[in-house]
Amino acid sequence: MEVQIFGTKKCRESQKALRFFKERRVKTHFVDLAQRAASQGELKRFAQKFGAEALLDREGRRFRDRGLHVAHVSEARILPMLEEDPGLLRTPLLRAGNLLSLGWDEGEWKERLREAAP
């Protein structure tokens, strides 16, 4: 199993995910969103599963700084906005084949690794 992790080096939750997989010797590919934004296709894949609204980090500083906590953002505008400003994304986004996860949930990934074990 190889896990792709979208996050930033400053994000504690992304660091927890990286450490979790490293400790279990699971190969990871880290995409630093501060260096390279997630592609529109990747964002669409996560939005189809969780909804575009769920991808927004409503508790993040960038969300408040842009005044989005008081504005109504339509579903159609969320993906282009996330593409343009990855700092608005709730991280980490994790993908292992067809398995997708939004935010860090250690229990969920322990179960997934158990299921994937030969």
Language-model-derived ranges and their functions:
Residues 1-24, 28-36:
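Local sequence-structure signature of Cys/Sec-based thiol-disulfide redox active-site neighborhoods
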Residues 33-118:
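Thiol/selenol-based redox catalytic cores and closely related redox-interacting motifs
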